[in-house]
Amino acid sequence: MIYQALKSFLIPILVSLFRPNVSGLRHVPQTGKAIIASNHLSFSDSVFMPLVVPRKVTFLAKSEYFTSPGLKGFIKKYIFIALGQVPVDRSGGRRSEAALLTGLRLLSEGACIGIYPEGTRSPDGKLYKGRTGIARMALESGAPVIPVAMLNT
């Protein structure tokens, strides 16, 4: 509910200010499980992509967004939780396994999840080697993977 309210409020503002150029939305299924895999250039990627995709996108977001100290950390955590984002521990091993299982559960419920296969933002705009979690989720769930290229964000 908060997701749709924020989306309805922000879309006109962001579209009029930034004029995003979007093509290929026909490849995003209207219902059912799907994985949107994108490069990650800036924090704004996580704002723009869900706004232009016509259905809810649940991101697997780094756990630090949910545990930062102070008022800024509290606000960030509240926003991410309100938008239904899921914390991911990127330290590897069993901790990362829990994130994969959460992603698989969401996909089994018909969710559309967003993931940045590189695992973090690119410091220089280049595409870096992706991690294997997205391939594992796609293979185990049978969800289609929709590649996305974010440019000039």
Predicted regions and their residues:
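Soluble catalytic domains of membrane acyltransferases
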Residues: 3, 7, 14-153
